[in-house]
Amino acid sequence: MKASELKEKSVEELQQTQIELLEEQFKLRMKSASGQISKTHELGTVRRNIARVKTILREKQGN
């Protein structure tokens, strides 16, 4: 997920994307805790994507 793609989305779309990423992060954390995760790098990737979405949301909201 690139920042340029996120900048084109509306605030509502960004909020929906953030919710989806948080759900995915939760699922990956549960897999990690139970030892079922095979691609451990996905957890870090999702975390960085959440940070990207939050950054763009702040820019759009002017805070």
From Swiss-Prot:
The keyword Ribosomal protein applies. It holds the Pfam family Ribosomal_L29. One of its GO terms (molecular function) is structural constituent of ribosome. One of its GO terms (cellular component) is cytosolic large ribosomal subunit. It comes from the Bacteria. CDD domains: Ribosomal_L29_HIP. Keywords: Ribonucleoprotein, Ribosomal protein. One of its GO terms (biological process) is translation. Belongs to the universal ribosomal protein uL29 family. This is Large ribosomal subunit protein uL29. The lineage of its organism: Bacteria, Pseudomonadati, Pseudomonadota, Gammaproteobacteria, Oceanospirillales. The gene is rpmC.
